[in-house]
Amino acid sequence: MSPRVVEHTSDVAAPIGQVWTRVVSPEGINDEMRPWMTMSMPRGAADLTIDTIELGVPLGRAWIRLFGLLPIDYDHLSIVALEPGRSFHEKSTMFSMKSWQHERSLTPITESMTRVYDRVTFEPRWFMRLSAGLLRRLLAAFFAHRHRRLARHFG
């Protein structure tokens, strides 16, 4: 099965530095995902920041929780590329995904407006392959939700 791709772009009414700080913080990530899901930080990674992690080295399992309560998946998290203040590329495996890549980039439009671009490339594990089309639609809706939440945060 070939990997599936989901892309989403939106403009956020805030300077790029403020948007970057928000999108790489655990609070910002979880705020984007709520109320549907939350994601824990991997054990031992609580004191790390996007600026202090070692690229390409797995950080450990980040648990994905439905409604913030019920563990439904994990993300064996690894950041493989980083342009501080601009972009990151996560390359991971999950219980449900043989391959998961999340690329997020920020581009300044003006001093007070930032374009946020997400590209998710995923390949479900064998037991999820029949639902790959549904997963793609759910992920597209979920990333649209995340972008709305991020834009709403900056008002």
Model-derived regions, located:
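Hydrophobic ligand-binding cavity/cleft-lining segments
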Residues: 1-54
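Short, surface-exposed coil-to-beta transition loops
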Residues: 5-7, 72-76, 98-103
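Generic structural detector for well-ordered beta-strands
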Residues: 9-13, 78, 105-107, 121
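Short strand-connecting beta-turns/loops that link adjacent beta-strands
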Residues: 15, 84, 109-113
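Hydrophobic pocket/interface hotspot
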Residues: 19-23, 29, 62, 79, ...
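Glycine-rich portal/gate segments that line the openings of hydrophobic small-molecule binding cavities
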Residues: 41-93
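Beta-strand/loop substructures that line and gate deep hydrophobic ligand-binding cavities in soluble
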Residues: 89-141
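Short, linear, compositionally biased motifs with a strong N-terminal bias
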Residues: 154-155
